Structures are given as C-alpha cells and as structure tokens.
Amino acid sequence: MKKTSTFQNGLIWFGAGVSLAEILTGTAFAPLGMAKGFAAILLGHIIGCAMMLLAGLIGGRTGRSAMETVKMSFGQKGGLLFAFLNVLQLVGWTAIMIYDGALAVGGIFAIGRWVWCLVIGALIIVWIAVGVTDLGWINKITMAALFILTLVLCKVIFFSGNAMVGIDGESLTFGAAVELAVAMPLSWLPLISDYTRDAEKPTQATWVSVLVYGAVSCWMYVIGMGAAIFTGEYDIAVIMVKAGLGIAALIILVFSTVTTTFLDAWSAGISAESLSAKLNGKKTAIAVTVIGTAAAILFPMDDITGFLYLIGSVFAPMIAVQIADHFILHRDRFAVTADARNLVIWLVGFIAYRLLMGVDTPVGYTLPDMVLTVVLCLLAEKAKPTKQM
C-alpha cells in the first residue's frame, strides 16, 4: 500500500481540526470570558492531545490500526467491544457533522436541510471513493481555501470593531469547560493510528498530526467563543451572512464538514474490519455515510454535550490501560482471547468517570480518571500471581 508523507498527514489533521462542531462547542465557553475560556480550551487540548499522541505512537510503532492496537491490551475478543463502540461513535459523529453542516448552510441558502444533508453526504462518499492515500491535490486545494476563509472569519469576529457583549451568568464551570475541550481530541484518539500506521515516518507523522490538529482545534474553539462574546451570536451561519461572506461561507461550511466527516466514516470502515475480516473498509465507510446522512435528515441533533461526555467515559479509561501496558509495563496481550483483568479495570475507570462528572475539578474528569486507571493497572500487575490472568 502507498505510504503517506508527513505533510499529507498534517493536511489530513488540519482538515479534521477545521470543524463546525468545534466552533459550535466553542460558543459554550462564552460565559467564562475570553481569558478564562481560552485557559480552559488550552488546558483541555493539552490533556486530550497528549493522549491522542500516545495512541498514535502505539499505532505508528506497531503498524497496526487503532482498533488492532486496542487488542494488544484487551485481547482478540476484548478488543471487539471497543471496535464496536468505536463504530457506533463514528456513525454518531458522521450523523452529527452532516446535521450541523446542513443546518448551518441552510441558514445561508434555505433550500431545505435534507437537500444539504444529501449534498454533504454525496461529497463525503466522493472523498471515500478517492481514498486517504490518493487525495493529494484535492486536499491541498481544499485546505488552502479553508485556511484563507477561516482567517476571513477571524477578521469578521475579532477585528470588526465590535465591543464585548455581556454574557449572563456562568452556566459552565471551569472544570466542565476543560472537559469539553478534552472531548474533541479524545474523540479522535480511537482513529489516529488508522492514519499513522500508513505513514512513511510514523513517529514524525504522529507528532505533526497531533500538533496541527491541536493548534487548529484550539483556533476553532476560540472562533466559536469569540463569536458569542463579541457578536452575541451563537449561530456561525448568521455571523457569516451579516459579514456578507455568501459563497465563501458556503465553501467553509460544506468543505469543513466534508473533510472532518470523511475521517469519521473512513475510520468506521477500518474499525469494522477489526470486527470481521469479511467486511470491506471502503464499502463499510460508504454505508456509514449513508446511515449518517439518513439519521441527519430524520433526527434532531442540536445538543451533543452528553454524547461528548459519553465518548470520554468510554475511551479515556481505554487509552489509560493501553498507555500503562505499552509504555510502562511493556505487556502485549494481542494473542489471547480476552484479558479479563484489563476489561475489569476499564469498567472501573468507566464508572469512575461517570461519578467524577458530579465533582467539579479544575482539570475536568478525564485526567483524574486516567491517573486512577493507570494506577489500577500498575497495582494489578504488582499483585498478580506468578501465572498471568
């Protein structure tokens, strides 16, 4: 298979970062104010991207897909649980991204949300048909256009002479805000190895991918937060219309949705291959896009906060177990059917995350939950009998 360059990987993750979902999530930070909100965004991304980096390095070192690396900690059958949960997550993300994109574009060109769902879905299928290693010039042109247009959007929001608009109350605590910032890179964590494994220089590609994604994602969050604070407007499409962006707004909204959602659908196909060797990744990715498009047409998906927290509770303890096994204990359970010990530790981590959601910590829930999970892995290893579980 043709290998991807470090530059190509950077472009892929630039496209992932330029996302309407990130901008919309950023608007929720407005009650904190610019300084406190930016601190929460930065801290959350440092935590989330550190985990994303370690997940990518595992895939890069081993040459395995994201869900195949999970089997190194949870065994062949144990890994299937996370492959299944990841496919569900990615179907959900595909639907949410298409819904958000269609809703936003519909605010500019009102020809019906379902029409824009179909247009965006069709473009994603074109991206899938071309394939991740052959996007080449398409990606370069698209990313250049998105970069220029997001700069224009920044100018409209931050340099149009608008005074700060008063935001009532502080409905979001700092800890909850940090967690919302962690959630985006965390949601990409079960995907990154699907791309780093095909890189010419896996370690270099992983670092570049994470740094590019982290920087761009922070930028999108700040655009959303700034839009709410400086314009008092939470609908990014309305801001674009008021700024007279017109066709430029259409390009930003449609192609940012396509370049991000393509990765969701593509990785859903790769994860499905971990579930069954009979499944074809590309065909499954197209099927996921069709399902996501249908769901976006049929169901409302305006509040994704609960979905983001659910992703955190599933995948934070999962990667914590992987980090402990790969980087500290040097333990590989790929050959076993299921690693009961690690599955129990993951379940404890999952429950702990849900309980931590009721506690407001300055660093959110993910970091304490991961520390707890890693400590449990180390204690379990120390306490194990001579014969391994």
Language-model features, listed with the residues they occupy:
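Juxtamembrane transmembrane-helix boundary signature
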Residues: L42-F74, L81-V87, E381-T386
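Membrane-interface loop-to-helix entry segments
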Residues: V115-I157, D168-G169, T206-Y213, L308-A320, ...
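C-terminal membrane-solvent junction of multi-pass transporters and transport-like membrane proteins
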Residues: K3, G169, A320-M389
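Membrane-water interface regions at transmembrane-helix termini and the short interhelical loops
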Residues: T27-P31, L57, I96, D100-I108, ...
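Transmembrane alpha-helical segments of multi-pass small-molecule transport proteins
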Residues: I12-G17, F82-V87, I108-G131, A144-C154, ...
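Membrane-interface "cap" regions at the ends of multi-pass membrane proteins
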Residues: M1-K36, D134, T173-V178, P190, ...
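Extracellular loop-to-transmembrane helix junctions
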Residues: T27-L57, G78, Y213-A215, P368, ...
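Hydrophobic transmembrane alpha-helices that form the core helical bundles
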Residues: G78-I111, V258-S274, P317
